[in-house]
């Protein structure tokens, strides 16, 4: 059988939210540039989205993401982190138990 996870993922069609794509195409025709709010983090970035700013919801607030050509094929959620890394704790802060 074998592992086919990556093979299947590459050969599937990308998921693009139709509402978002329609808004982007309409804005491309009119030449308008405004921020679009998006809750759909699993939406794949397409060529039509390049040059637009999309505000992606991370669970608390909307993070503005400017779409560049290198981002095509990635998901919107990759650029809007849901967790903040505050660093590792200091070694001096650890409490060492002695028996």
From Swiss-Prot:
What is one process in the GO biological process aspect for this record?
A: ribosomal small subunit assembly
Q: Which UniProt keywords apply?
A: Ribonucleoprotein, Ribosomal protein, RNA-binding, rRNA-binding
> Single GO cellular component annotation?
cytosolic small ribosomal subunit
Q: What Gene Ontology molecular function terms does this protein carry?
A: rRNA binding; structural constituent of ribosome
Q: Is Ribonucleoprotein one of the keywords UniProt gives this record?
A: yes
Give yes or no: UniProt keyword Ribonucleoprotein.
yes
Domain of life (superkingdom): Bacteria
Q: InterPro entries given for it?
A: Ribosomal_uS19, Ribosomal_uS19_bac-type, Ribosomal_uS19_CS, Ribosomal_uS19_SF
Q: Which family does it belong to?
A: Belongs to the universal ribosomal protein uS19 family.
Its biological purpose: Protein S19 forms a complex with S13 that binds strongly to the 16S ribosomal RNA.
Protein name stated in the entry: Small ribosomal subunit protein uS19
Organism per entry: Sulfurihydrogenibium sp. (strain YO3AOP1)
């Amino acid at each position: 059988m074998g592992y086919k996870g990556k093979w299947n993922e590459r050969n599937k069609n990308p998921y693009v939210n139709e509402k978002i794509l329609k808004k982007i195409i309409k804005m491309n025709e009119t030449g308008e540039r405004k921020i679009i709010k998006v809750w759909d983090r699993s939406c794949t970035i397409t060529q039509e989205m390049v040059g637009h700013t999309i505000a992606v919801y991370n669970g608390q607030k909307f993070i503005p993401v400017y779409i560049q050509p290198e981002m095509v094929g990635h998901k919107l959620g990759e650029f809007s982190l849901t967790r903040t890394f505050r660093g590792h704790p200091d070694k001096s802060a650890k409490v060492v138990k002695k028996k």
